[in-house]
Amino acid sequence: MIALLIGAGLALLCALVGTPLFIRLLVRRGYGQFIRDDGPTSHHTKRGTPTMGGTVVVAAVLLSYGLTHLIMFLMNPDSPGPSASALILLFLMVGMGLVGFLDDFIKISRQRSLGLNAKAKLILQAAVGVIFAVLALNFPDESGLAPASTKISLVRDLPWLDLAFGGTVLGAILFVVWSNLIVTAATNGVNLTDGLDGLAAGASVMVFGAYTLMGIWQSNQACGSPREAGSGCYSVRDPLDLALLAAIMSAALVGFLWWNTSPAKIFMGDTGSLAIGGAIAGFAILSRTELLLGIIGGLFVLITLSVIIQVGYFKATGGKRVFKMAPLQHHFELKGWAEVTVVVRFWILGGLFVAVGLGIFYAEWVVLL
């Protein structure tokens, strides 16, 4: 618990101090956001706002995680160091962040709304996702438990939904596909949500907060631990270190949100949204709560569905629309809601999804107790 407090405190401080310094750097270089003309007219005033703020979040997370383990080692040389699960998750976050950084840089340098084309972006995301999936199935601990498994999970692995039903090789291939679906869905969900000042950052704070609580609980109730509760114990690799990383992510985003809230001094850009989405997907996979992510990240799912419905209905009806504009947050803007009103109400909605997800997580343990 001390490590979580140290890590969160460091991440908050790094993001709070680092973000304004990064803003000054971007302003000097003229790296500002390009705003589409077909978006809400109220957004035109945001043209030129510094972007790529996700760089600060990623840097704060990496620095805080490393420093926390260094401090814990200095306090107690026998304390466990960085875990395989956390390092693999950090790889996914950084890899996706680099894809987003490249996308942002192209937009800024060419002053257009399109960065990487869809095909190139998907290929790069898939490449990072494949490497993550392969790494996650390897590096077993002394008991043979790897960071991830081929079983699809809800609150824990579901033994009757094992992708390795046709053998180890087929299971590994299917896991790579399944893992990439989760990563792609999460990254695109956060990316679509990042359309209003503070919306994606605030919603993500709550999601990472949920994974912090779940990681602590999984550690307390780990199979083989003194506090194990029979059939309700969890077989998760490095749950407490994952909880530390989730707490660091949440705190770093709070620090960034201080500058990203309306009126935003900086945007996270695709650098941030893809890194955050990748991290969220990584937590779901490594904490064995893959299907539960659909509820905990329900706000991202809802916003993504609004785009799918809008595009599908538009094509099916020859130009008609369900919403005034998609993603969903812009629909309410065009209905006359103030941007801050939309953001706060969507935060409330996101918080409710997180609460329901946590309720399901703990209720399942009570049932198995």
From Swiss-Prot:
GO terms for molecular function: metal ion binding; phospho-N-acetylmuramoyl-pentapeptide-transferase activity; UDP-N-acetylmuramoyl-L-alanyl-D-glutamyl-meso-2,6-diaminopimelyl-D-alanyl-D-alanine:undecaprenyl-phosphate transferase activity. Its cofactor is Mg(2+). Its EC number is 2.7.8.13. One of its GO terms (cellular component) is plasma membrane. It is found in: Cell membrane. InterPro entries: Glycosyl_transferase_4, PNAcMuramoyl-5peptid_Trfase, PNAcMuramoyl-5peptid_Trfase_CS. PROSITE patterns: MRAY_2 (PS01348). It catalyses: UDP-N-acetyl-alpha-D-muramoyl-L-alanyl-gamma-D-glutamyl-meso-2,6-diaminopimeloyl-D-alanyl-D-alanine + di-trans,octa-cis-undecaprenyl phosphate = di-trans,octa-cis-undecaprenyl diphospho-N-acetyl-alpha-D-muramoyl-L-alanyl-D-glutamyl-meso-2,6-diaminopimeloyl-D-alanyl-D-alanine + UMP. Signal peptide: none annotated. The chain crosses the membrane at residues 2-22, 55-75, 86-106, 120-140, 163-183, 196-216, 239-259, 266-286, 291-311, 348-368. It comes from the Bacteria. GO terms for biological process: cell division; cell wall organization; peptidoglycan biosynthetic process; regulation of cell shape. Keywords: Cell cycle, Cell division, Cell membrane, Cell shape, Cell wall biogenesis/degradation, Magnesium, Membrane, Metal-binding, Peptidoglycan synthesis, Transferase, Transmembrane, Transmembrane helix. It is an enzyme of class 2 (transferase). It is a multi-pass membrane protein. Pathway: Cell wall biogenesis; peptidoglycan biosynthesis. HAMAP family: MraY (MF_00038). Catalyzes the initial step of the lipid cycle reactions in the biosynthesis of the cell wall peptidoglycan: transfers peptidoglycan precursor phospho-MurNAc-pentapeptide from UDP-MurNAc-pentapeptide onto the lipid carrier undecaprenyl phosphate, yielding undecaprenyl-pyrophosphoryl-MurNAc-pentapeptide, known as lipid I. Belongs to the glycosyltransferase 4 family. MraY subfamily. This is Phospho-N-acetylmuramoyl-pentapeptide-transferase. It comes from Pseudarthrobacter chlorophenolicus (strain ATCC 700700 / DSM 12829 / CIP 107037 / JCM 12360 / KCTC 9906 / NCIMB 13794 / A6) (Arthrobacter chlorophenolicus). The lineage of its organism: Bacteria, Bacillati, Actinomycetota, Actinomycetes, Micrococcales.
